[in-house]
Amino acid sequence: MEDKFEIGRIIRAKNISDAWYRGLNIIWNHGQVITDERGSQIREFMDLMVVIENPYTDRIPEDTAWNEERLEEYAKQLISGENAQDFEYTYGQRLRNWNEEVDQIEYVIEKLQESPTSRRATAVTWIPPVDTKVNEVPCMILDDFKIRDGKVHLTTLFRSHDFGGAYPANLYGLSKLLEYVAGRVGVEPGMITTVSISAHVYDHDWDMVENIVKGIN
């Protein structure tokens, strides 16, 4: 582990599992320990970009606590917008019913059907009048869909990204969402790129991450 402050790395990963392990390795070995605004200690690496070339194979890392049943439920909520457990918000809710006004996924699909080279097929989760006044706010901020080279690709921006606990679920859900959008538009699903402004692991996951990284190296 290094104390030298560093910003910005790019990973080109084969699949979700490869992305997770390599991301954890960078955070653990090149991140800095800080105390966040809630008083939690995290090891953080800023501006980590991960390009996942095939997010449809090896979607569930061996060392994650997530199992297929929980991941499928997560993906279902992301695509449908359901909030069966009455959370303060869900990503699906923000994408499907933004500010109780806009189904952004339908907008994305229609935009890509109308104009396959569109640069406007973008969905956001942040609602300024709401999220500037509450404690629980979205970590995933933006999903951008583009059709290039005959496939629809997804780029997702996270302002804050719990790499140890949430990354496998986030990417499983996003890969299912991209398959859904691609199916509706009538093209093949492509690559997923994540941009994590604060890619971090919480102190309660440090033992797990240290053991994983030792196994990698």
From Swiss-Prot:
Subunit-structure text: Monomer.
GO molecular function, one term: thymidylate synthase activity
Domain of life of the source: Archaea
A cellular component annotation (GO) from this entry: cytosol
Pathway of action: Pyrimidine metabolism; dTTP biosynthesis
EC number(s) per entry: 2.1.1.-
InterPro entries: Thymidate_synth/dCMP_Mease, Thymidate_synth/dCMP_Mease_dom, Thymidate_synth/dCMP_Mease_sf, Thymidylate_synthase_arc
Name of the protein in question: Putative thymidylate synthase
